[in-house]
Amino acid sequence: MSSTAISRLIHPFVKDRFLHALLLAGVAMFAFHPQPLSALGGFIDGRTLITLLGLMLLTKGVEVSGYFDFVGRKIINRLHSERRLALFLVFSAALLSSFLTNDVALFIVIPLTITLKKLSALPVGRLIIFQALAVNAGSLLTPIGNPQNILLWSCSGLSFLGFIGQMAPFGVAMMLSLLALTWFSFPARDIVKTPNTEGYPYQRPLLLSCVGLYAVFLLCLDFDLPLYGLLAVFAGFLLLARRVLLQIDWSLIFVFAAMFIDVGLFTRLPPLQPAFAAIAGLSEGSVYALGVGLSQIVSNVPATILLLNYVPSSAQLAYAVNAGGFGLAIGSLANLIALRMAGERKIWLRFHYYSLPLLVWAALLGWVMS
């Protein structure tokens, strides 16, 4: 491997302040309450990391093929106003997240949106923010839309349609709220296009190879063989397009691993154990507030896992942790994926201009509807 390639791999780790903060927090908690090193590995959800890495590689492969550019040009040549385009992208992200899970939806819509930056003068950063919010709103509707819903559904005793019926009032209300916010946040002015937006060639063999590898990867996940699926994807790109392996955000994998370890250390801190044990005796309102608030600290999936140890699965708990996906970026892993993929430093602050008011609205709406 050349020195340029090595530098390209190392650079994101050096610049990743969020990863540095997670590592410092982990070291501090480990020093306060040491754990066996073997336990640290147990905190990491290996399947999630493998799935994330596989999707990152496959999405980057499609991007390198040029197909996102091709589709992006088709879209902006059909939808001529910023508002119509924003509504289309936001609704598409929400719809995909309902049935493909929120992270898979993001790996489809975010790279496509990023290509629009090359084709027009669109506010791509704002579009990505709204797509991150959209997958939080859309994924809460179904049992398979996000990891917390999968957990809640498995513990609820409800049928697939029964769970959808439980979540529908909140999901529809949040989606309508987000579409209304999208309408007011994007003007109806015409899209200013760059020259030569009528067509764009793409590498068909690489695209078809990515589609084939995607099918293999999904089958391996379905048969509970995620590592074999990842190895197949990795081997495929070694043979077809090695540059893909150098272009993905490798530090994101370490961010998620560090988050899993930090959450594991946090939930085992001795001073917090009496507080956790008291959860079972809390009132419904207190459990709801805790679900929303805890999601802002450890993210909504770990918050769900923790709370299900003490309270039963219910509509109220489901509304709480899904509302908690809004607010701070850490509230949902989908937020972190979207903002990292955007690659804009200022987007992290701008995200909270929209997400924090939506957290307040979602928390109030969820409480009233539950």
Question: What do these predicted regions represent?
Answer:
Residues 8-9, 73, 184-211, 243-246:
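Flexible interhelical linker loops that connect adjacent transmembrane helices
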Residues 9-16, 37-48, 158-170, 198-203, ...:
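Interfacial loop-to-helix junctions that mark the boundaries of transmembrane helices
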Residues 43, 65, 69-74, 212-312:
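Transmembrane helical segments that form the transport core of multi-pass membrane transport proteins
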Residues 45-48, 77-89, 119-127, 204-208, ...:
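Membrane-interfacial loop-to-helix junctions in multi-pass transporters
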Residues 89-91, 95-140, 305-318, 346-348:
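Hydrophobic transmembrane alpha-helices that form the pore/transport pathway of multi-pass ion
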Residues 164-175, 289-370:
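C-terminal transmembrane helix pair
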